[in-house]
Structures are given as C-alpha cells and as structure tokens.
Swiss-Prot record:
Chlorophyll a' binds at residue 675. The PsaA/B heterodimer binds the P700 chlorophyll special pair and subsequent electron acceptors. PSI consists of a core antenna complex that captures photons, and an electron transfer chain that converts photonic excitation into a charge separation. The eukaryotic PSI reaction center is composed of at least 11 subunits. This is Photosystem I P700 chlorophyll a apoprotein A1. The lineage of its organism: Eukaryota, Viridiplantae, Streptophyta, Embryophyta, Tracheophyta. It comes from the Eukaryota. The gene is psaA. One of its GO terms (biological process) is photosynthesis. Gene3D superfamilies: Photosystem I PsaA/PsaB. P700 is a chlorophyll a/chlorophyll a' dimer, A0 is one or more chlorophyll a, A1 is one or both phylloquinones and FX is a shared 4Fe-4S iron-sulfur center. Signal peptide: none annotated. Its EC number is 1.97.1.12. HAMAP family: PSI_PsaA. It comes from Oenothera elata subsp. hookeri.
Length: 750
C-alpha cells in the first residue's frame, strides 16, 4: 500500500452539450461514415451499413468519443433488458395461471402464453392442469417469483409497470450522457473509482438489498406458502416490512430488533440466517434461509472490497502498482504495461470480461440443477433442461466473443514498439510452442476419446460385450471424479463442520429428495460411460481453444503472412497472386471457432439431457421405488456411437416427430423449419462467390431485357459476408432444432 499526497479536490469530469441532438442526421442511413452516407451504388452498401453501424472504431479514432458511444449504448442495452423483463412480468400478470400454480405447483404446469384462435392454432393451448389451457413455459419465472414472495397477479402488473419506467429512465440516461453531460476520457480510465463503485454499489449494496428483501418479504411469505396457507390470506409485503410483530410471530428473535447485532450476539439471528446445506424437502429447492445468509455474507465481502482502492484520499491499492509488482520467474517484466493496455483498449478489457463472464455463466448452468435455488424448480424437468442448455449456449458464445475481441485488440490496439519482454510479448514470442503443443493435445484427445467409442462399437457389432469398455466388462471408472464427489459428500463431518448437509445432493451421501412423487435430486453416480463422454468434452473444448487462441496469437503476423496486421481484422485472402492465403484472418478464426464451440456445447447438453433422464429424473412410488424416465439406460447405451444415435437421438426424437395434431405440434414445425434453416446455411458455406456473381449477371441481363433493372447494382456477397450468413444460419438452425427436440421430449415425458 502506498500513501501519496491527495489529488487536487475539484475535477471537472464531464463536457456539457458536446453533441447536438439531431433527428435529421440520424434519419440519414450511414451518417457515421462518409462512404456509406453517400448512399447505395451496389447492394454491398446494405451489408457495409450493418457491419459498421456499431463498429465505433471505424467512425472515429478519438478514444474519448468511442468511450462515450459505448457508454451510451450500454444504457440503450439496459433499456431493452428492462423492456424485455417488463414483458415477461406483464405476461405473468395478464396471460398466466400463476395464482393457480402457486396453490398447487406439483400438479399444475406453469403457463404464461395463450394462443389466439385464428387458423386453428388454439390446438397449441395444452391442458397444464387446474383447468387452464395454454403453452407450458420453461423459463423458471414462476419459481423465481414464488421465491421473491410474489403472491398475486396484481404485484406482477406493478412490477411490469416499474420495469417500463426504468426502461424509459435508461433511454433518457443514454441520451443525457452523450448529448448533455458526456464524461471525459479520464472518467472512463479512473479504474480505482470504478472498482470501488461497482464492487460496493452494484455487488455490495445490491446483494445487501436482496438479502434484506429475502429476510423481510420472501422468507415469511414462503413460510406461509409452504404451510399451505392460501396466497390471498397471506399479509402483503409492506405489512411485513412495516410491522415487526408480524415477523416476530414467525421468527421470535425479530422482536429484539437490532440489539443482538450491536451486542455481537449474532447467533440470535440463526433462525432466519441458516447454514444448513442440502435441499428443503417441501419444495426441493435450496433453503431460502441459507440463500438469505449467503447474500448477506456476499454483501459484507463486496462492501469491504469496494473500499480497497485508492481514490481521492491517498490510501488503498493502486491497480497500476499491483500489476507492475506482479512478476514471475519466467515472465520477464511480468504484468508491466498491462495497466496501459486495459485503460486504452476497450477491446482488451472486453475480452477479459467476456472470458470471465462466459466461464461464470457455464458455472451457473452446472449449479442450477445441482443446487436448484428456487422452490419447485428441481421437479420442473422442462425448466431444468432449458436453464442448463440456455446457460451453456450463452457461456459458449461469450467465450468465443472473448477471443474475437482479443484478436481485434491485437490488430487495432496493440503497439509492438512499446511492448518489450512483458507477459504478452513473452507469450507472443513462444506462440509456436504453445500452438504446436495444443495441437498435439487435440490430436491425442481426439484419437483416444473417439477411439474408445469406436472400439466399443466394433466389439458390440462383433457380439463381444465382454471385451467392451463398460461398467460390466472392462471398467474405466472416473476415479478422480468419484474421489471429489466423496470428499464433498463427507465434508459436513470433516472440512465443513458447521454445515449439516453437503452443498449438493449430487455429490452423494444423502437420501434422494422427492416432491409430489417426482425426484428433485439424488446422488448422481458416475461410471465408465461418463468417463468416455468427459474425454469427448475435453477434446472439443481443446479444439475450440486451439482455433481461437491461434487466431489471437497470429492475428498480427505469421510466417505465411508477415504483414497480417496491415490487412485488418477480417480479410478474405492476401491479395491476388498469393494462393493458399485465404481464411487466415483473425475473423476467420472466430468463424471456425464458432463451429467447434457448437460441437462442444452440443455434446455437453446431450450428455446432461440423457444422464438426468436416465439416472436422476423420474417418479417415486409410495413404497419408495424410483422409476427413471429412461430406466437407467445411460451407463450401457451411451458407451457406443450407435447407442447415442439409437437410444438418445432417435428414441427421444419420437415425441417431436410424432407431435403433429397435439399441443406440442409447434415443436414439430420448429424441428422441421430449423432443420431447413440449418441446411440453408450449407448453401453459403459450400459455395464460391464467383458462382453467384455469374448467376447474378445472367439475372440482371433478363431484367435489362424487360427494362426493369434497378438503379442499385446487384453484387454477390463478399466471401466474408457469405461466411457470416452461413455461420449464423448454421448456429440458429442447430440451436432451434435442439430446442424443439429437447422441449417436445421433456414436456411429453417429464
């Protein structure tokens, strides 16, 4: 920690009225670019308009102006998010069976969309129970609302209106902070102040207010709901907040107020701030008292963290000092210079944030099923599957985005003249060693993981089950994973003496939790089948990383194209007369990385979907006998490629393929349509530009003959544009196909 003389008191951190508000200018397409603003000569114009509209770097090189545009755009983004949330709450208020679901969440399905009968599509309104007909939703909003203590549709209306007000406020803020009071560059670069405010304000006070809401509103209301009290009889949130006696009836220590807090007699609060672990047997969700305790603890941590960085008071940590002190034995100057990179290149900053947020999103996916946070979430299998799949896809996209912006940083913002012998320079100088080793790892993993399956398929085809890798023949048990499971299952008695149960039932060690005759969670066994598919996960992840990392490390130069930096982030080839230099731009690596990200995530969600249906989800009889949805067939069927095709893809696609004429028929149509969208992508990916240009010339000739030729000249898509359209339809088609396949299946059987 370094103590410096305090900085001068008053800093002017905004410019007043920097840019006038002009609707005339905005109405002109391409106003941000001299070339595009001239209007279209060829059809390429519309593609350039879309490509460059949000590429603020191409509008100006002034970092302050770029920063203001990004800042303003963030408010626009928040406005859209509030608008979307408002729509979700409005549907809950206007078109849903929320109040009915609240009274009987085990027998009534959540629905918040009722289809209007226009051409007979009211068939989609299935019977979700309780006499309500609508589309079953799998977003988890009902469970979230119950956990928040929302007991009526009126409360949802109010929240929806509140979100609209916030959306308007955000739109105003976006305009105000660009046109009326725009922050100076120094404000965007003041990282210590930003850290303090974000840590203490957003994360600290945000968590504290949520903990407060949970203690004063959610806990008492859920206490009543769990006891079977009619939601209409339960006091309203403001009554709990204003009347301490009401709370004291449920939690006697409330009568003492804040005295135990100030007298350090904190154990008095153990009634509603618990450390139980495991799941509430009534709802199959985490104990809400544990969740409140968790948010309170998180709030304390972040409030402290938000006071650690040096600003006007000359005390605390400085980010620059921390980074420059960070030197390892093999990394030369270490992190010296990273501070300058991260305060002058928003692409570098964004890249780090995307990598961390993407990883965090995938962590969320894995916790949503192993530690289901909301009441009745664990037994809503459609929602569980949707939440896992959604967070996996989002995480995958964010991580590819991290590589994209790292490469843009390398091309546009990296200055090799000022970087010598720091961490980044060291990595770039031995990039060949990194990439060739990574390539070797990919080859090893690919041949060995796939080879295990091929061996099993061959032995199975030859009728030699005793020679297969399986739990009943040659075992390949995941011993490390089982050891980790065991360690966590035993933790309450050993490493976590304060907890009564382990963090998740998935580790093992406990009895299954069932709600309303359905399994919420049970110890998840791991065996040879999991060992095999986990190595496929390792393979696909490493290949994705290989492609993306190669794109970043060779973004500026390579042996093939030493002057790559001059060609920019995306270019088709290194000019005419240099064969074999196509698809080498940093953009192309992102393009290729997206396909492998899609491979990787697909295997993960297929593994999850089948494993849960086979070994976890199912019903339980009065005698305590569990019947799983697919009867535990994962361990023996998923060990061959044929098993995956026959017993997973084909067997479980029967619901979506046979959905016509039922309330699930929309999924059948989506399944078909999304296959078409996916196939359409191949037309762009497997075809050359010249083919289309020739075809266009011929069509233009016909138009000229008929004297209906347009003023704007038609042009074939450029190579990069064609690939963009291709990968977009490939991913969109693939994801929508998977969505229809999963949901038709799980809504029918779950």
């Amino acid at each position: 920690m370094i103590i410096r003389s305090p900085e001068p008191e008053v800093k002017i951190l905004v410019d007043r009225d920097p840019i006038k508000t002009s609707f005339e200018e905005w109405a002109k397409p391409g106003h941000f670019s001299r070339t595009i603003a001239k209007g279209p000569e060829t059809t390429t114009w519309i593609w350039n308009l879309h490509a460059d509209a949000h590429d603020f770097d191409s509008h100006t090189s002034d970092l302050e102006e770029i920063s203001r545009k990004v800042f303003s755009a963030h408010f626009g983004q928040l406005s859209i998010i509030f608008l979307w949330l408002s729509g979700m709450y409005f549907h809950g208020a206007r078109f849903s069976n929320y109040e009915a679901w609240l009274s009987d969440p085990t027998h009534i399905g959540p629905s918040a969309q009722v289809v209007w009968p226009i051409v007979g599509q009211e068939i989609l309104n299935g019977d979700v129970g309780g006499g309500f007909r609508g589309i079953q939703i799998t977003s988890g909003f009902f469970q979230l609302w119950r956990a928040s203590g929302i007991t009526s549709e009126l409360q949802l209306y109010c929240t929806a209106i509140g979100a609209l007000v916030f959306a308007a406020l955000m739109l105003f803020a976006g305009w105000f902070h660009y046109h009326k009071a725009a922050p100076k560059l120094a404000w965007f670069q003041d990282v210590e102040s930003m850290l303090n405010h974000h840590l203490a304000g957003l994360l600290g006070l945000g968590s504290l207010s949520w903990a407060g809401h949970q203690v004063h509103v959610s806990l008492p209301i859920n206490q009543f709901l769990n006891a079977g009290v009619d939601p209409k009889e339960i006091p309203l949130p403001h009554e709990f907040i204003l009347n301490r006696d009401l709370l004291a009836q449920l939690y006697p220590s409330f009568a003492e107020g804040a005295t135990p807090f100030f007298t350090l007699n904190w154990s008095k609060y153990a009634e509603f701030l618990t450390f139980r672990g495991g799941l509430d047997p009534v709802t199959g969700g985490l104990w809400l008292t544990d969740i409140a305790h968790h948010h309170l603890a998180i709030a304390i941590l972040f409030l402290i963290a938000g006071h650690m960085y040096r600003t006007n008071w000359g005390i605390g940590h400085g980010l620059k000092d921390i980074l420059e002190a960070h030197k390892g034995p093999f990394t030369g100057q270490g992190h010296k210079g990273l501070y300058e990179i991260l305060t002058t290149s928003w692409h570098a900053q964004l890249s780090l944030n995307l990598a961390m947020l993407g990883s965090l999103t995938i962590v969320v996916a894995h916790h949503m099923y192993s530690m289901p946070p909301y009441p009745y979430l664990a037994t809503d299998y459609g929602t569980q599957l949707s939440l896992f799949t959604h967070h996996m896809w989002i995480g995958g996209f964010l991580i590819v985005g991290a590589a994209a912006h790292a490469a843009i940083f390398m091309v546009r913002d990296y200055d090799p003249t000022t970087r010598y012998n720091d961490l980044l320079d060291r990595v770039l100088r031995h990039r060949d060693a990194i990439i060739s080793h990574l390539n070797w790892v990919c080859i090893f993993l690919g041949f060995h993981s796939f080879g295990l399956y091929i061996h099993n398929d061959t032995m199975s085809a030859l009728g030699r089950p005793q020679d297969m890798f399986s739990d009943t023949a040659i075992q390949l048990q995941p011993v490390f994973a089982q050891w980790i499971q065991n360690t966590h299952a035993l933790a309450p008695g050993a490493t976590a003496p304060g907890a009564t149960t382990s963090t998740s039932l998935a580790w093992g060690g406990g009895d299954l939790v069932a709600v309303g005759g359905k399994v919420a969670l049970l110890p998840i066994p791991l065996g040879t089948a999991d060992f095999l598919v986990h190595h496929i996960h390792a393979f696909t992840i490493h290949v994705t990383v290989l492609i993306l990392l190669k794109g970043v490390l060779f973004a500026r130069s390579s042996r093939l194209i030493p002057d790559k930096a001059n060609l920019g982030f995306r270019f088709p080839c290194d000019g005419p007369g240099r064969g074999g230099t196509c698809q080498v731009s940093a953009w192309d690596h992102v393009f290729l990385g997206l396909f492998w990200m899609y491979n990787a995530i697909s295997v993960v969600i297929f593994h999850f979907s089948w494993k849960m249906q086979s070994d976890v989800w199912g019903s339980i009889s009065d005698q305590g006998v569990v019947t799983h949805i697919t009867g535990g067939n994962f361990a023996q069927s998923s060990i061959t490629i044929n098993g995956w095709l026959r017993d997973f893809l084909w067997a479980q696609a029967s619901q979506v393929i046979q959905s016509y004429g039922s309330s699930l028929s929309a999924y059948g149509l989506f399944f078909l349509g999304a296959h078409f969208v996916w196939a359409f992508s191949l037309m762009f990916l497997f075809s050359g530009r010249g083919y289309w240009q020739e075809l266009i010339e011929s069509i233009v000739w016909a138009h000229n003959k008929l004297k209906v030729a347009p003023a704007t000249q038609p042009r074939a898509l450029s190579i990069v544009q064609g690939r963009t359209v291709g990968v977009t339809h490939y991913l969109l088609g693939g994801i929508a196909t998977t969505w229809a396949f999963f949901l038709a299946r799980i809504i029918a059987v779950g």
